[in-house]
Amino acid sequence: MSIIDTRTPEPKRFISGATGDWEVVIGMEVHAQVTSESKLFSGASTAFGAEPNSNVSLVDAAMPGMLPVINLECVRQAVRTGIGLNAQINLKSVFDRKNYFYPDLPQGYQISQFKQPIVGEGKIMISVGPDNKGQFEDVEIGIERLHLEQDAGKSMHDQHPTMSYVDLNRSGVALMEIVSKPDLRSSDEARAYLTKLRTIVRYLGTCDGNMDEGSMRADVNVSVRRPGGEFGTRCEIKNVNSIRFVGQAIEYEARRQIAILEDGGVIDQETRLFDPVKGETRSMRSKEEAHDYRYFPDPDLLPLEFDQAFVDALAAKLPELPDVKKQRLVETLGISVYDASILVTEKAIADYYEAVAEGRDGKAAANWVINDLLGALNKAGKDIEESPISPAQLGAIIDLIKEGTISGKIAKDLFEIVWNEGGDPKKLVEERGMKQVTDTGAIEKAVDDVIAANPDKVEQAKAKAKPTLAGWFVGQVMKATGGKANPQAVNELVKSKLGIEE
């Protein structure tokens, strides 16, 4: 199969070497565990964290005479994912045996798909940025294919000083291997691609995307070349299990290859591992070619066939996907592309935001969700589903600001109280005397007191006749009133009394 270069060399993506510029070329093979209660060819459970070898059927253990039976839900999930990737759905596909020996592969082969996968070419649009101007760059990344295959078991080498153990709980679990074209040109693009792919499968409900549990793993193919030149020899970095590590692995590997080539050496085609502690890759084995696995159609499984009506029925029930949702939020709620990009990263966050924004100013809601709520959740190590503040409570805080009942500063304090103690924001404001002071007489007295106490500042303000110093006086008045004074009223009174004009 010939590889087509679809990207024009971009100098901002180049890596500077001792002998000139280099371009990194990246392709990714992402293994995503299919969300299904049972395995690809058996009825054994896929539950994470079970006791070793407790989720193993006779099929998974490769007992003689046990035949695989396709799990239709795994087929549906693969088709849903293919539709979400704007990909060609193949109405006929074939399962093949990929032959190799390893202790955690009891059959002596893996059931996969080689020449006829269930999903063909597709594409993903990623956003890279923001740059120093706050702008994002959209880049289209091609999808080569998606195929279904079995996962292997797990070898454990730390349970006994002289023996290794095998846990077959993962053996036979359904995986979708999603193969990109070699269209990625930087570690930033690779991170954005993996983030976007994880977002899509989570929206679809076809994979939970939990990389720390092994539900999503990436094999990263990296090569370097002179800008616009022929593709270089690639090295595959296996089983990278975090988006951050993907970026680190690419940056190290690209530099390693450039150093070898600039010293007159050649790159060996090999499989490597990434060591996150040392931040470097190391050689694992020479890279296998397809013929090394002796693929042939599995004689125990008929070709997988379905009609277009099957595909159409699944497509009709797909949820709104992140790109469509982002565009809708920008157009209907008037928020920035940057804010929308953050909000749609997780479906649960987008749902929370839309509940808060319903009937309210979209920009104000976005500001509170992104800066205050997500900031607090991140600090506490919580997910949006674990938020102590409900959309209704956060919406009530925003309403109190809009009504003029509380100031922005008091709203921050109220947010902390609701976060820690719960309760109805409106009642809390009443019970704790947090209402904003709107009585002009009371505010004017506070302004007069601050002016009287700072004659030197008054002279400076009047001499300059500029509004810049007014902010200092406003701050002092807000401090004196415990943040309860209406900031707009304070600002107007300060400027009036100091004779400052806009």
Curated annotation (Swiss-Prot):
One of its GO terms (molecular function) is glutaminyl-tRNA synthase (glutamine-hydrolyzing) activity. Disulfide bonds: none annotated. It comes from the Bacteria. Keywords: ATP-binding, Ligase, Nucleotide-binding, Protein biosynthesis. Its EC number is 6.3.5.-. It is an enzyme of class 6 (ligase). It catalyses: L-glutamyl-tRNA(Gln) + L-glutamine + ATP + H2O = L-glutaminyl-tRNA(Gln) + L-glutamate + ADP + phosphate + H(+); L-aspartyl-tRNA(Asn) + L-glutamine + ATP + H2O = L-asparaginyl-tRNA(Asn) + L-glutamate + ADP + phosphate + 2 H(+). GO terms for biological process: glutaminyl-tRNAGln biosynthesis via transamidation; translation. InterPro entries: Asn/Gln-tRNA_amidoTrfase_suB/E, Asn/Gln-tRNA_Trfase_suB/E_cat, Asn/Gln_amidotransferase, Asn/Gln_tRNA_amidoTrase-B-like, GatB, GatB_C_1, GatB_Yqey_C_2, Gln-tRNA_amidoTrfase_suB_CS. The keyword Signal does not apply. The keyword ATP-binding applies. PANTHER family: GLUTAMYL-TRNA GLN AMIDOTRANSFERASE SUBUNIT B MITOCHONDRIAL AND PROKARYOTIC PET112-RELATED, GLUTAMYL-TRNA(GLN) AMIDOTRANSFERASE SUBUNIT B, MITOCHONDRIAL. Heterotrimer of A, B and C subunits. Allows the formation of correctly charged Asn-tRNA(Asn) or Gln-tRNA(Gln) through the transamidation of misacylated Asp-tRNA(Asn) or Glu-tRNA(Gln) in organisms which lack either or both of asparaginyl-tRNA or glutaminyl-tRNA synthetases. The reaction takes place in the presence of glutamine and ATP through an activated phospho-Asp-tRNA(Asn) or phospho-Glu-tRNA(Gln). Belongs to the GatB/GatE family. GatB subfamily. This is Aspartyl/glutamyl-tRNA(Asn/Gln) amidotransferase subunit B.
